[in-house]
Amino acid sequence: MSFFHTRKYKLILRGLLCLAGCFLMNSCSSSRGNQPADESIYVLSMNRMICDCVSRITGDRVKNIVLIDGAIDPHSYEMVKGDEDRMAMSQLIFCNGLGLEHSASLRKHLEGNPKVVDLGQRLLNKNCFDLLSEEGFPDPHIWTDMRVWGAAVKEMAAALIQQFPQYEEDFQKNADQILSEMEELDRWAARSLSTIPEKNRYLVTGHNAFSYFTRRYLSSDAERVSGEWRSRCISPEGLSPEAQISIRDIMRVVEYISANDVEVVFLEDTLNQDALRKIVSCSKSGQKIRLAKSPLYSDNVCDNYFSTFQHNVRTITEELGGTVLE
C-alpha cells in the first residue's frame, strides 16, 4: 500500500518526517561547530541538499559536515576562516557543480581537487538527463526534480562505496532505501500537482530556481517535448539571485502575469522580497494578484531536503488550486 494513501499513514508520515528532521539536523553538522566523535573519516558536502542524502547513505559510519548551511546563498558564498581546514581533513568533498559554487575562493579549492565529487558534471558525463541552461549558463537547481536528484544520489553512493569499500553493503542498502522513497515522493508530487487546473499552472518566483520542477511537475508531455514548458515559469532574477533587478525585469514579469491571468506569486525564503512586492503593486488595476501565504525553499532547506521538497509541492499545489493527495 502506498505510504500516502490513508489518513492513518498521513499521520505516521508527518511523525516520521519530524524524526527525520531531527536526525538529519544532527547528522549533518554545521561547518561552524561541533568536533566529531570519530576523527578518522570525514565527508564534506557543500550544501544541505547534498548532506541530507549523503548522511542517509553513510549512517554513523562517517562524520558528515556541511559547508554552506542555513540562510546563506550558495551562489555567492565565499570561503571563511576554517573552511580550508575542513576541506583538507575531509576524505571526500561533494559539490553540486553546474556553476552553483562559482565564487573565486570556492573554485580555487574545488577545481582540480582529486577529493571532489562534482555531481552535476557526473550527470553531464553520463548524459542520463537533459540538464537545463539559461543564456549559455547551466542551471544548477537539479534537486528540485526528484528524478534528476535521484540520479545524483546514485553518484553519491557510488563515490562513497569506491572511497570506503569496507562499508559497501551498508551504503548500498541505505541508498536503495532512499531511492525507493524518492520514487514514491516523485509519484506523489506528480499526482498532486496534476490536480492543478491547467490554466493555473504558471509559477512566478523570486529567481529562476524552479525550471527543473516546472518541466517535471507542471508541464504536459507535449510541452516537455516541444520546449513550451518554459512558458510555465518566470522570475525577475536569473539563475543566481546576485544581480540587480531592473525596472525592465519587473515589467517583463508584470506582463507575463497579465497575459496568463496569474493570481499568485511565490516568495522564496532567503531572497529579498522587494522585487515581488513591486510586481504585485505594479500589476494592472482590476487584476487579482497576491503573494503566496508561505514561501518556497529554493537554495536551502527548512528541516531537511525531503520535507522541504514536500513543503514546496504542498504550497504550490494548494496555492494554485489543486489538491494535495495523501
Curated annotation (Swiss-Prot):
Record carries keyword Cell membrane: no
A Pfam family hit: ZnuA
Effect of residue 190 to V: In strain: L2/434/Bu
Subcellular location: Periplasm
A molecular function GO annotation: metal ion binding
Binding, Fe(2+): 75, 141, 207, 299
Example GO BP: metal ion transport
Induction: Up-regulated upon iron starvation (at protein level).
InterPro entries xref list: AdhesinB (IPR006129), Bact_metal-bind_prot9 (IPR050492), Lipoprotein_PsaA-like (IPR006128), ZnuA-like (IPR006127)
Highest rank taxon of the organism: Bacteria
GO cellular component: periplasmic space
Keywords: Iron, Metal-binding, Periplasm, Signal, Transport
Signal peptide start-end: 1-21
Gene3D superfamilies associated with the record: Nitrogenase molybdenum iron protein domain
Similarity comment: family membership: Belongs to the bacterial solute-binding protein 9 family.
Record's function text: Part of the ATP-binding cassette (ABC) transport system YtgABCD involved in metal import. Binds Fe(2+), Mn(2+) and Ni(2+), with a preference for Fe(2+) and delivers them to the membrane permease for translocation into the cytoplasm.
Subunit structure: Monomer.
Full protein name: Metal-binding protein YtgA
Organism (species): Chlamydia trachomatis serovar D (strain ATCC VR-885 / DSM 19411 / UW-3/Cx)
Origin organism lineage: Bacteria, Pseudomonadati, Chlamydiota, Chlamydiia, Chlamydiales
